């Protein structure tokens, strides 16, 4: 029960509401029209045609994730302007206060690399950030997930604090962005990911190299280029992973990718070190990293540590298809 006779409580409540956006309840989504894009578009009273997304999705028949650039381009075709930037917590708050719901790229749950989330507001009194939740409550009202600002910013930093703005041109023109010059470089990263999904590796590499030419400090571009080179078993991937980490020493995926490269090349000490740094940044982000580290530790005769890693793997990924094999390995170690 709120005590409305307490003026400070009432002031804090009103101040909190000033920083929250009322977003539409949306359930429809498609790999080419991801939920965050659909929510923000409907917020601006623009209904993106699902039929268009379904038709586009036919070329990605065997892909399970979301293709953000397809949704972004659909929104742009229907009148919205998009900016993709590396941002900050203070800038995110300014964007919300202008009335724009930002989309941020955050770490995924185990076995989902990343996910996009719509931020619906913040509360500086409680030091929380509000995430849009897909389903409303029983009364059909908007629900929000609250996360402490410090934890949000810590997790957001793992992928370079990427932020997507979708808004009408007259609204977008009213704000001055901190890293607007890097916008084209960031867009090329999203385009390159689509090209990779389409198995067009050469064009994807070209897009990433151009992205780095435009912004040599684009950690996302450096990571993606390193990943493609890693897939080709090229030693060149190491320098790009290292450049990415130098720019953002909390870039989880870069440590994990570098660890994978060293694992493939049987450089177990280096691999273990990279995995350890990734786990130190976020111990719950990936289950597979524990299985990989268990493998190399078993090779190094570190059976007790390998056993603990396999237990962590199953704890984070209880429905793993190889659960039976892993449990047997744990018993044998």
Predicted regions and their residues:
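TPR/TPR-like (Sel1-like) alpha-helical repeat modules
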Residues: 280, 298-321
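Active-site-adjacent substructure of cysteine-protease-like catalytic cores
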Residues: 76, 81-132
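Residue-level recognition of tetratricopeptide repeat
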Residues: 218, 251, 285-286, 320
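Active-site-adjacent structural segments surrounding the nucleophilic cysteine of cysteine proteases
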Residues: 1-63, 108, 125, 185-194, ...
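Canonical tetratricopeptide repeat
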Residues: 224, 257, 291-292, 326-329
């Amino acid at each position: 029960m709120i005590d409305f006779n307490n003026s400070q409580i009432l002031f804090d409540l009103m101040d909190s509401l000033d920083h929250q956006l009322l977003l539409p309840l949306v359930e429809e989504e498609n790999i080419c029209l991801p939920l965050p894009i659909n929510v923000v578009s409907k917020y601006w009273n623009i209904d993106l045609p699902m039929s268009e997304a379904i038709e586009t999705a036919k070329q990605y028949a065997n892909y399970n994730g979301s293709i953000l650039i397809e949704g972004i381009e659909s929104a742009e075709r229907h009148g919205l302007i998009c900016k993709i930037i590396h941002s900050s917590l203070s800038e995110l708050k300014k964007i919300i206060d202008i009335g724009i719901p930002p989309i941020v790229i955050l770490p995924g749950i185990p076995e989902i690399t990343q996910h996009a989330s719509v931020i619906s507001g913040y509360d500086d009194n409680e030091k929380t950030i509000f995430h849009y939740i897909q389903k409303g409550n029983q009364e059909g009202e908007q629900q929000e997930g609250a996360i402490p600002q410090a934890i949000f910013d810590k997790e957001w930093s793992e992928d370079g604090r990427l932020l997507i703005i979708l808004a009408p041109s007259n609204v977008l023109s009213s704000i001055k962005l901190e890293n607007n010059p890097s916008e084209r470089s960031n867009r090329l990263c999203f385009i390159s990911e689509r090209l990779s999904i389409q198995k067009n590796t050469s064009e994807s590499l070209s897009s990433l190299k151009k992205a780095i030419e435009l912004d040599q400090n684009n950690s996302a571009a450096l990571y993606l280029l390193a990943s493609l080179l890693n897939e080709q078993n090229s030693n060149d991937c190491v320098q790009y992973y290292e450049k990415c980490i130098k720019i953002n020493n909390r870039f989880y995926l870069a440590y994990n990718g570098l660890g994978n490269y060293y694992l493939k090349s049987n450089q177990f000490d280096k691999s273990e070190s990279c995995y350890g740094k990734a786990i130190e940044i976020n111990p719950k982000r990936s289950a597979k990293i524990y299985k990989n580290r268990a493998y190399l530790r078993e090779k190094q005769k570190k059976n007790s540590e390998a056993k603990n890693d396999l237990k962590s793997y199953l704890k984070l990924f209880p429905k793993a298809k190889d659960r039976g094999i892993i449990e047997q390995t744990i018993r044998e170690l």
